[in-house]
């Protein structure tokens, strides 16, 4: 059971928006006392708003929130917090927040996000922040409905008389409290659902029969598919066996192909070996003609060759070391020469520095003379002169400090007098500003008063106009009431309700007729389904017949007649196509065999071309250094031979000439005669002859080296060309064989192309036959479908005839469409009448609202008239305030004139003092500038002399001598290095000559080794060729061909048998595909659909029966619950009335609930009072006190009966309009109720009253120790104070 714990209020009504006021609710009784207007009712309003989210009545425009004008703010935030325990005794906190903003002309109230917290196990969990969710969650947590919280538990004082309100409002509130409309709507929905489900059950029965037929047909198709799959499995196993035999046959063919390929390869190898032998023989002959054959063994030649290589390597290493040595010497020579050039430059620089120092001495002497004359110095010593200059600078600085100090003292005194005068002026200015500010405020106030006066000035005229408007409004209200009485809206409403009752009775009769008609709806539904199926299948049959005829004419080029036997005709055509296919497939297999043989020969030719081309590339790479033809190479070899011979002769002649000239000189010196002519020579001729011989001897070595080098080049070229000649022979032979092989390949490719053309023709004919066979097979399947459809139509006709016999003839007399049409018209009429009733009610409500609005507007006008009277009084007061303000302004203006006259009197004296101050400042600046200039000049002289002295201390002559000596040593090193380079060059020339002789001897040994290697290669090639020729004689080439033909025949036969089996398998697969397509398209999930429909039909039938039972039980339960609750409520009301009411005019009161329509589930409510046997409506016949007492008692009874989970009840001013006896009686009854319910843990009675005597009568000190007093503080803010009883 739920209960409330405490609540805090902030910013609601008269409660302050800056602080919270809290109240704790006790069990079983909480008393709240306060004077009228203190804020007691606000507590009930906050409880109702926190639990339901409903604002109190008449709170539009933010009246529920603390007024911003009172607190002087533009925006006020309000908040209500309620702590309570839900039905599970879990503590929860509900927080609701509001905001009221005031703008220039409007107010805006805004509901902010709230919060619903749950506190469990010391953890805080937020359930929701949305206001809409709080409105539903809080009543749910308290265990009562929102209507019960609104109308019973936390009922507002202004709405507390609702039990005696007009019938419509009373019915609405009782229906909300009992939640009767919800149950009535649920019951109507259940019954409507039951009727709909009965119709659905009948349709489901027909659908179930149809699904059963589809299921049986699907099972037949699945059986046929299963048999076809078994046949396909057998065929595939047979095909696998054939595939193994075909693979084995292909393997044997491959082995024979490989044997044939090996034979051809051996022939190619033999031809290649013959060609290679010819090339080697040619090379051997050429090599013998160009070399000297030695008798040494190959091992000796190899050793000699390797020794040559070592010697050459040693000589080359020695040559490289000498070259490196020469390079190092050249680098050293270069660096020494660069250093020599640098030293020469340094000597020039030092010479320049010596000249600069001489000039600097002259400048220094000139400056010293200038200083002596400028400062009148008698010293001759340089140091003494610099000391005198420093003293002069110090003296100038000291004189400046003394003079500037005196001027600054005078300046400070003048400045003090200036500041005093300015302070007095500032005081006067501030005074003027204050008077001006005060004057401006006075003028602003006066302006505002005049503005307000101008605004209120038309009020007098408005008051007269409003008086006339109030009189017109009274007349308008009177006319509206007369018009409302003339329309007779209540009589019109009764008329429409009578017509609506008649229409609903006729609809009930039609529902009974439809129920009786639906007993045989299952048979009619089946007939309708069968007729639709027959129509659909007939249309499909006609379409398929047309498709069959058009397809047959397209395939066979002639039309099929209606009386033809489709199956026999198609079987004949299929057999004819099968025979043609067999013939063409055999021809295609034969062509494929021939083509395979051609491809093998082409492959061998291509391989041979590739080998020859690759061999040619290898040979050509060896000749990449020679770009000429074979003929040009022969002529070039011959030319080289003659040129080599000439160069050898020339070299021999040169070697002989050197000996000859030396012998001639010897003879000339000894015998003084010429060696050739033996003529004697005199001294002059002898001298000339010796010089000539020496010049010839000097020329011969260089000429011999030149001729030797050229001879070496010619010999190397001759050797390269001699080696290339046999390779040219091989390339010519390869070109010839390439040409022959390409010609053969071209012929084979031409034959293959012819075979391909023939094969394409046969393949085209095969494709045509395959397409025709496929079309014929499709036609066979179409004929089969047509037969199935004809059989299905005959079955439907038989089943339809059986159903027509079962259908009774009496059903035909009722036309269901006409009945439904009449029901539709009645439904439209019922809707129209209901709209008319609603429209009449709306019109009545509108008239009443119009009258109420007019009355409200009239009251507002009267209120405005009163406000205008107040404004006229305010206008008179404003006139007085304006006059007083004018007098104040005149007084302030006089004061302003007095102060202004005193301003500016000290201005001339102030100007004189400021001029004097500026003059003193200028004198100080001038003195400082002069002193700084003299000090800077003296310091500059001293600085320049110090710098020049530093430069003159450097010793340059010693450095000059050192560099000159170093330059002489470096020059000597350069000459020594140059002589070493010349010696190294002589050694390099001698070493080159030794290397040339070694290479000539090495080449001859290498040629002998190469000749012996070629001889061995020739012997190996001849041996291998003889072996291959001997092998060829043992092979029988014809046997290869016979065995190949046998294997090809077997391969073709196996493929033909395999193709036949695959064709049959293809036909079966097509048949299975068609059957599966039929299953997927027409019978997809037939079993599942039948099973689901069977389950659905059975379960829907059973569920519909249970739905009827549930509707009947719910109807009875609703009526019993309502009757039981009303009896209990009336019992409690009777008991409380008799115990409370002290008068004798009314024995008791009760609540009557009269049934409104058929079914006793809709009620009209009224409160009656009983006197003896008479029972009268209490509304309009009771006094104000009886009205208050009756409403309290009814609320107590409703809370007792319906608030089982929530024992809370709040009474706001329960003693209103009660006399003293009834107050005492009500207090005693409340005390008795508290005493009886105090054992209930969650019972909480909240009493709010201004009557403290009533509190004592309730016997409050027996149930609680404290009570709460609500009052206003000094700021007129409501506050809650806890006080002891």
Curated annotation (Swiss-Prot):
Keyword Transferase: no
Cellular localization per UniProt: Nucleus; Chromosome
Binding sites annotated in the UniProt record for ATP: 13, 36-37, 39-42, 65, 67, 157
Coiled coil regions in record: 295-365, 630-668, 698-726, 727-809, 814-902
Binding-site list for Mg(2+): 41, 157
Protein's job: Component of the MRN complex, which plays a central role in double-strand break (DSB) repair, DNA recombination, maintenance of telomere integrity and meiosis. The MRN complex is involved in the repair of DNA double-strand breaks (DSBs) via homologous recombination (HR), an error-free mechanism which primarily occurs during S and G2 phases. The complex (1) mediates the end resection of damaged DNA, which generates proper single-stranded DNA, a key initial steps in HR, and is (2) required for the recruitment of other repair factors and efficient activation of TEL1/ATM and ATR upon DNA damage.
Protein's name in the database: DNA repair protein rad50
Source organism of this protein record: Schizosaccharomyces pombe (strain 972 / ATCC 24843)
Gene name as annotated: rad50
